[in-house]
Design a protein with these regions (language model features):
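Alpha-helical transmembrane segments and their immediate juxtamembrane cytosolic regions
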Residues: 1-228
């Protein structure tokens, strides 16, 4: 999956490593106390998310990775999200902690949107550092979304639909870029074909529906169903 392939396939390497590391994470989650999990998450947030995001911003402004010498090899990368999901499942946020989580998530979303608007205008820099998936702002938003999902009541229909969608997610991940390329690069559909907000919604739903359909078809093929 190297070379001239879909740009989204880089994440397959991460998925493979996460699956390899899953037994180790299971040991941690089965035997660690709440305080130990909190310690691991704090280490991850400081040395992976915050340090990584600072390094990303430094690189965008032409500096070396200013914290490269001070980042120890600890729980890093997407593995921290594994632990965060387990922690929030085992110890759901309540009361003031939940409200603070939502406030920080809203502020983070504002920082992400504001940064994407202000940085190009002020410094002439187009950067993805502000919304980096392994960054503090994205983590706060993800944690809030996870917390919200824990408090949603699901109907009987939803309990049937969600497992079906869950089984199709990997196929959707693999195929959605094909439909994006088909839409914008082969059919040359312009992003401004209608009102921008509506265009984003229509395009997103269309790509998702097409990818879901193809993923479902692939799941019916014996050779492919093992993978999707």
């Amino acid at each position: 999956i190297t070379g001239n392939t879909g740009y989204h396939l880089w994440f397959l390497y991460t998925l493979i490593m996460l699956y390899i590391a899953t037994p180790l994470f299971r040991l941690i989650t089965c035997h660690a106390s709440k305080r130990q999990l909190e310690y691991a998450l704090v280490v991850w947030i400081i040395f992976s998310l915050i340090a990584g995001q600072i390094n990303s911003f430094a690189a965008e402004f032409g500096f070396d990775e200013v914290l490269s010498l001070y980042v120890p090899f600890v729980i890093t990368g997407y593995g921290g999200y594994f632990l965060l999901g387990h922690y929030l499942t085992s110890y759901p946020l309540k009361g003031a902690a939940k409200r603070r989580c939502y406030i920080l998530a809203i502020l983070s979303a504002c920082v992400i949107c504001g940064g994407k608007w202000i940085l190009p205008m002020t410094f002439k820099i187009e950067t993805a550092a502000v919304e980096a998936p392994l960054g503090l702002f994205s983590c706060l938003v993800a944690g809030a979304v996870f917390t919200v999902s824990q408090n949603i009541s699901i109907s009987d229909t939803g309990t049937r639909v969600l497992p079906f969608l869950g089984q199709r997610t990997f196929g959707i991940y693999l195929t959605h870029v094909f439909f994006i390329s088909l839409l914008y690069h082969i059919w040359h559909v312009k992003p401004d074909y209608c009102q921008p907000v509506l265009a984003i919604f229509v395009s997103s739903v269309g790509v998702f529906a097409a990818s879901l359909f193809v993923s479902w078809i692939m799941s019916k093929i014996p050779l492919l169903r093992k993978f999707v």
